[in-house]
Structure formats: C-alpha cells, structure tokens
Amino acid sequence: MSIKLIAVDIDGTLVNSQKEITPEVFSAIQDAKQAGVKVVIATGRPIAGVAKLLDDLQLRDEGDYVVTFNGALVQETATGHEIISESLTYEDYLDMEFLSRKLGVHMHAITKDGIYTANRNIGKYTVHESTLVNMPIFYRTPEEMADKEIVKCMFIDEPEILDAAIEKIPAEFYERYSINKSAPFYLELLKKNVDKGSAITHLAEKLGLTTDETMAIGDEENDRAMLEVVGNPVVMENGNPELKKIAKYITKTNDESGVAHAIRTWVL
C-alpha cells in the first residue's frame, strides 16, 4: 500500500538546529507533492508560527492542510477554512493559572492571535515562544481573560523547575486535559482528547485514507499520539529514546535532512 499522507513535526524534525529547511528537505517534499502525496505540517505552534514555512514549502495549494496547536486547530492552508477548532473554557484557564502559581512555574495562554501572561515578570521562555512563533505578548490579569478564546496553555520554565512541577500535577488534571511535553522547558495543556493523533485521524478519514496509507515523522513526546495512529511511524535519530520504541522506522537527524531521507527511502 503506497503512502498518501505524511504528517511532519517542525522543531527537531522538519527544520535543522538553525531552524532552517535544508535544500534536501525542500526537494523531497516537492517530489512527494508531485507524486500525489499530501504533506501536512503538524505542530504545537500556532498558525502564525508556520505561515512562512507553508509559503517556503509551497504548501498553500487547494487541498493542502495544516495541523497547529498540537491538534486543536486543523485548517485548509489555501483558504484558512477551519476543519477542527477546539478551545479551553475560562474555568479551565483559571484552574491552570492557579495550579501554575501553586507549583511555582511560569504560565502563558495562547489564542489564535497572541500570547497572554498574567505574570508581570514575563518568563524568558514566553519571550522565546513569542519570537519562535511570531506572535505578540500581552499582559492581562486573569479577570481580563474571560472573553478570550484560549486554545492552549503552557507551563514554561527552566527544565529542572518544570520537571519538579510536573511531578506535583494532580492526577485529576491528566483526566481533564491533554498534557504533553514538547520541549525540556515546555509543558502544553489542551482540551481533553485533543492531540496531533486525533487531528491526523480526522484528516485521514476525511480524505478516505487507510492507516497503512499514512506516515508521521516526529521527535518529541507531543508527537507520540500521531505516531501511534499512523501505519508508518518514523522517529528522528535525534528524537526522544522512549519515542523510538514505537517507531517502525528511524530516520537520520534533523541536521542530516532526516525528513528527506524518510520520504526518499520509504515513500517515493
């Protein structure tokens, strides 16, 4: 069975350590498109953080799709039409904000148009996220967030501080939300059952594809859900060792154009 859809993570996967798309990766993706394969970027970033990549990779044609916010938003790239759009409630936000203060970690909330923090001492990783995804930062008190459509919240801090906080997150939080670590300094909290896997499953069904016709390429824990639902899970050589245990294939590192290697070896 030939592969007809490839879901590709960005950071640590699609781009190299300099956050660049190598010529080899660009070429492989264009060849896959020419062969009729759907290449879908699937990322924890908001849409603003992938816009330039979609342009650079020429993934804005009719019938092209993008998965952002770790699966909370799925859109047609040519029109912006939303196929899936999930968000947290204001009560969810308040509970997360309260827990972050109790655990002593920075938190920010992300909408489709900005990053919001209730901490006047804005964390350096919030600034990093703002730069990475090309979104502005706004200071708002929790009371001023009631009218915002919050797609996800993130606990962000130094890895050792964040890891210590994760150990203290109540079990009921894992029952209420989708929680996954996307980087050593990022913990993402979304609506329950929202992840890259649910988004890719929905998209594959919409396109009439079988599991065997799908591939996902990733490197970190927030890629686990999509790697588990496709027939051909590929993990980067630089990926999380735990993630490699569920891989069908291990490709080269992101600095060795691993996405291109995967496409040319197992797809084309």
List where the protein language model places each region.
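Active-site phosphate-binding/coordination module
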Residues: P23-G123
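Asp-based phosphoryl-transfer active-site loop
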Residues: K4-Q18
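Mg2+-dependent phosphoryl-transfer enzymes with acidic/Ser/Thr/Gly-rich catalytic loops
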Residues: M1-L5, T22, E188-L268
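Short, structured coil segments at secondary-structure junctions
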Residues: E62, N70, F173-E175, V229-V230, ...
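Short active-site oxyanion
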Residues: G36-V40, D64, K152, D212-E213, ...
